Amino acid sequence: MLESLLVPTAIVALAEIGDKTQLLALILAARFRKPWPIIAGIIAATLANHAAAGAVGAWVSSFFTESVLHWILAASFTATALWTLVPDKMDDNETSNARRFGPFVTTLIAFFLAEIGDKTQVATVMLAAQYPHLIMVIIGTTLGMLIANVPVVLAGNFAAEKLPLTLIRRLAATAFIVLAIVAVYSAMKTSGWIG
């Protein structure tokens, strides 16, 4: 039973290193500067996503080819990069949307959506099929996400206090553009457009 917890924890923690959700954690920490609601949102989103991974993962992948998923990912990264560059009032003070949704709900939704089709979701599906203790697998994959993302949230909160938000926004937009380029390359490769 312990193996059903420890192996998924290690696999997901390693898979998360350098993943887009770490960048998302950094952006949310810099934007909201409230690490604990963000961490709580990551926990809730990961539990919900990974609990549904076994059932939903196979269903969604049956509707889209790998190539289509790469194109969707490239478009979402490009849109996120552009959105990141646009200053909003939340940078200076909370708007009604920020008060209405806040860091917890924003993180919950963003992380849940970012994990759909992600390698950690796929890993969760495979691990749940391999190990008999589903609850331990879900707890393990959630712990792996926390091991990888909590330090980023805390560092992002610290960096936001020391660095101008404009610089953080530009760096994040650049990173999302790079991710979009990689996703376009993957889409072209899986479509057979390049060798």
Question: Where do the PLM segments sit?
Answer:
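Short functional linear motifs
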Residues: 22-23, 69, 121, 168
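Hydrophobic secondary-structure block in the mid-to-C-terminal portion of proteins
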Residues: 132, 139-193
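Membrane-interface helix termini and inter-helical loops of multi-pass transporters
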Residues: 55-66, 119-127, 162, 187-195
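Short, structured loop/turn "capping" segments at alpha-beta junctions
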Residues: 86-92, 119-123, 135-138
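Small-residue-enriched transmembrane helix starts and helix-helix packing motifs
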Residues: 1-17, 36, 92-114, 135-139, ...
